[in-house]
Amino acid sequence: MSLDRIMNEAISPWMKGDGPDSDIVLSTRIRLARNLKNYHFPIMQTAEEANQITELFQQKLVNKTMRDFGSFELLKMNELTPLQRRVLVEKHLISPNLAETEFGACILSESEHISVMLNEEDHVRIQCLFPGLQLSEALQSANKIDNVFEEVVEYAFDEELGYVTSCPTNVGTGLRASVMIHLPALVLTKRINRIIQAIQQLGLVVRGIYGEGSEALGNIFQVSNQMTLGKSEEDIIADLTSVIHQLIQQEKAARELIVKNSSIELEDKVYRSYGILAHSRLIQSAEAATCLSDVRLGIDLGYIKDVSRNILTELMVLTQPGILQQYAGGQLGPEERDYRRAALIRERLRIEENEA
């Protein structure tokens, strides 16, 4: 595995498969937050301490112990260009916060479904990504990596509180479980705000696709647990799974309602969006996300039969600004990005050959 491959293949290998409920649930993520004993937390650590932690993981884990899990690559943020860091964020392999951290690093598996962030908000953040709804499977994978780390490093752990973290909401198990879910029908029927409020009352958080402070582009929402103290990993997973299953049923019911009451209007909306994607010469990322959401809904409902659902997932990633510029080989102005985005979408939908 090389940096060039990570940068030039916009779609991570793990994204190419389907998972359970993948018509509505795009992906599952498990993240475990850990800190090392006898080191200052990242907010207070020196450059020397940060580098010591990175070297510790490089020498004792990436080069040795983790070989049993396959090939891994350690990337230091201060050795990457701003554009390369942005691509990693857009592929959901690192957080926006890590991308801005001078002494941060990440460890990536070859399939990119395992990503370990070093010196972010906590010393160690183990992330596992799976397609569809696979919370238990992702947790099992993350725990395997965590167990390997714990044989080599000593974590900051309190017998009463659990794992000690920078943010109080992560103290305890250090577990953040999240699900990326596509809810266009709940948005169209204007039920989404009421449902989000109900979810938040259950102690869960609803955010946009890039986490805290981001918007729900393309009707894609990220639902995750908030507190970890006083709850077991199993309880956290069970609670979130229950809510996601309810969300899936609500979304399916909303889709059935729209088809029953407004079928022709919905079909028109789907094909208008498809027309924009198929023929536009300039398209901004927000408009592309909206149209891709409409077309994905049209595929799920059977209106569009000759386009793969996975192509839409792929295009949601491919059309992000950083990845577009990586493909172009450098920085692009806003209009040039919009032009290349439109061309890429047309090409991926195999429209150009029909227009020739």
Swiss-Prot record:
<keyword id="KW-0067">ATP-binding</keyword>
<dbReference type="InterPro" id="IPR022415">
    <property type="entry name" value="ATP-guanido_PTrfase_AS"/>
</dbReference>
<feature type="short sequence motif" description="RDXXRA motif of the pArg binding pocket involved in allosteric regulation">
    <location>
        <begin position="337"/>
        <end position="342"/>
    </location>
</feature>
<dbReference type="GO" id="GO:0046314">
    <property type="term" value="P:phosphocreatine biosynthetic process"/>
</dbReference>
<dbReference type="GO" id="GO:0004672">
    <property type="term" value="F:protein kinase activity"/>
</dbReference>
<keyword id="KW-0808">Transferase</keyword>
<comment type="function">
    <text>Catalyzes the specific phosphorylation of arginine residues in a large number of proteins. Is part of the bacterial stress response system. Protein arginine phosphorylation has a physiologically important role and is involved in the regulation of many critical cellular processes, such as protein homeostasis, motility, competence, and stringent and stress responses, by regulating gene expression and protein activity.</text>
</comment>
<feature type="domain" description="Phosphagen kinase C-terminal">
    <location>
        <begin position="24"/>
        <end position="254"/>
    </location>
</feature>
<feature type="binding site">
    <location>
        <position position="125"/>
    </location>
    <ligand>
        <name>ATP</name>
    </ligand>
</feature>
<dbReference type="InterPro" id="IPR022414">
    <property type="entry name" value="ATP-guanido_PTrfase_cat"/>
</dbReference>
<dbReference type="Pfam" id="PF00217">
    <property type="entry name" value="ATP-gua_Ptrans"/>
</dbReference>
<keyword id="KW-0021">Allosteric enzyme</keyword>
<dbReference type="GO" id="GO:0004111">
    <property type="term" value="F:creatine kinase activity"/>
</dbReference>
<dbReference type="GO" id="GO:0005524">
    <property type="term" value="F:ATP binding"/>
</dbReference>
<feature type="binding site">
    <location>
        <begin position="27"/>
        <end position="31"/>
    </location>
    <ligand>
        <name>ATP</name>
    </ligand>
</feature>
<dbReference type="GO" id="GO:0005615">
    <property type="term" value="C:extracellular space"/>
</dbReference>
<feature type="binding site">
    <location>
        <begin position="207"/>
        <end position="212"/>
    </location>
    <ligand>
        <name>ATP</name>
    </ligand>
</feature>
<dbReference type="InterPro" id="IPR023660">
    <property type="entry name" value="Arg_Kinase"/>
</dbReference>
<feature type="binding site">
    <location>
        <begin position="176"/>
        <end position="180"/>
    </location>
    <ligand>
        <name>ATP</name>
    </ligand>
</feature>
<comment type="similarity">
    <text>Belongs to the ATP:guanido phosphotransferase family.</text>
</comment>
<dbReference type="InterPro" id="IPR000749">
    <property type="entry name" value="ATP-guanido_PTrfase"/>
</dbReference>
<dbReference type="InterPro" id="IPR014746">
    <property type="entry name" value="Gln_synth/guanido_kin_cat_dom"/>
</dbReference>
<keyword id="KW-0418">Kinase</keyword>
<protein>
    <recommendedName>
        <fullName>Protein-arginine kinase</fullName>
        <ecNumber>2.7.14.1</ecNumber>
    </recommendedName>
</protein>
<keyword id="KW-0547">Nucleotide-binding</keyword>
<feature type="binding site">
    <location>
        <position position="92"/>
    </location>
    <ligand>
        <name>ATP</name>
    </ligand>
</feature>
